[in-house]
Each structure stands twice: as structure tokens, then as C-alpha cells.
Amino acid sequence: AGVTLVRDAGDRYGINDAIRDEQRGGRVAVRSPGLGIKRPKRYGGFMARDIETGGDVAPVVAAMAATADDIKIILTGIIDFAAGDVKGAPQFDEDELRVMVETAHAHGRKTFAHCSGLAGLEVAVAAGVDSIEHGFFMTPSILDVMAEKQIAWVPTVSPVHFQWARPDLAGWDANTVGNLRRILDGHAEHIGLAHRKGVELVAGSDAGSPGVAHGVALVDEIFHFLDAGVAMAAALESATSRPRRLWGAASADVQVGNRADLLILDASPFDDENALRSVRLLGG
């Protein structure tokens, strides 16, 4: 599929750190947060550690920054597809999240937040996280703040799209399928709006979710951007130079002295977007 930069989003078993370390200097660069951060008895136990009180936040983030490439925060729950809404209130308030962000920045690390729903999105943008992952139930006003503060958005359309496209595998009824379609339509509308407002859109697939295959799902995500009205050049940037620039990866663009981390296709995607699925050569 041509993927040469992977940003993992948390793993309680440390496999992400191990793969990152094994791949150093190899073809694929892996960024790992190690464990994310969450509240006890809330969503995210498979990828995050618990923080009990606000007083624990700064020292925990400082300690994590010693080995983490980025700091992952589980700010909200997941979407209840049957109800058509996010489960529960935000796990952290604005003050707690701001301490995490400021501590991470003080240690040279960026933050990214698992977040959907208006309540969580308001906390995320107010605290100044560097990137919002998922961001379902987005609003135009939140996008305005994201554009102003240069907060990136990784919309991860693919997992929800799979749930809608294959309800037979998930056992969804007609009501839930309708909710999924409504969620996807709203998401696409706001992705297009984000593009027009100048929000830093980044293609990320949430690979490993049901029906979301590593590698090829990133190409699917580019197609979701195109379907939402994102121009081809911007959609390609969202999966190439932009994430490299935002996450601080080496060789973010084509310049003398940079690594030639190039994807060669059989044809130009500007002439035929399906050329994105026909990789001829991976350079670098």
C-alpha cells in the first residue's frame, strides 16, 4: 500500500514500542506513545493506563515523555451506534487536559486525543491538544477554533464506514444502520468544511478496528476525503507530507538532502484516482 510512516495510538502490552525500536533505520518509521492516559473504569483499557486524580497528571506525563514519541489521551468514550451518540461524559476536564498538554510540550512531545462529541471536542480545543483523533459529531464552530489554533484532525472514517457497509457482520438493525449513515454523512460534511476552513486534515485509518486492514485502509481514507470534497492535492498531502511535518518526522518533503521516500504509481491519480491502488515502486 506504500505506507512508510505509522503513528500508533496506544498499547498496554508494549508491542508498539518493540516494533518501533525494531524498525529504527528501516523502511517504515513507527511513532509510539507507549500507553495512553485514561480514567479508571472508563474506555481504553487495552491501550492506556489509569490516572485517578488531577494531581497525578503532570508527573505521569513527564515520565511517559521519556520514552513516548507522542502523548495519547483518551478524552471520551466510543460511539454507541445503536443510540447514535457518544457514550459518557469526557474523561478529563479542561484544566486537567491543559496540564497534560503543557507538560507534554515542556518535554518536547505533542498530544493527540481520542475524542468525539461536542462536550469532548470543546474540552480538547480549549486545552489546545495538537491533534484530535476521530472527531465525530464535529461542528463548524469547533473547526473555526481548530483552524485558528492549528489543531490537526484525523477523522478516521473507515471504521464507521465498515460498520455501515457490513451490518450483517456486526448484527446491526435498520435503526442502527440509519444512525451510522447519518453519522457518516455529518462527518463527510465537516471534513469538507474543515478543508475549506484550512484545518490541518490528516489521513489515518484506525487500522486494527473491525474491517479496517493495515495499509490499504489508508488509501480508503484518502478516497473518503475525496468523496467529502477535499481536492486531490490536499488529500494526497494529508497522507504524505502533512503528517510528517506535523509529527516531526524526517524528510517531510522533496528537497536536496532529504531521504527519497517516494511512492511510484502506475498512473497519475490526478487523471485516475484509482491509480492510488496501483503501487509500482516504493523508493527511499
Stretch-by-stretch model annotation:
Residues 14-17, 120-121, 139-143:
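Short, well-ordered alpha-helical microsegments
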Residues 1-105, 151-160, 166:
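Divalent-metal coordination cores built from histidine and acidic residues
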Residues 93-104, 112-125:
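N-terminal active-site wall of soluble small-molecule enzyme domains
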Residues 2, 30, 71, 104, ...:
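Divalent metal-coordination and catalytic microenvironments
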Residues 126-131, 147-153, 171-174, 198-200:
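Glycine-enriched alpha-helix->loop->beta-strand junction motifs that scaffold or abut catalytic
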Residues 106, 110, 171, 175, ...:
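His/Asp/Glu-enriched, well-ordered alpha-helical/loop segment
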Residues 112-113, 130-139:
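Catalytic beta/alpha-barrel core
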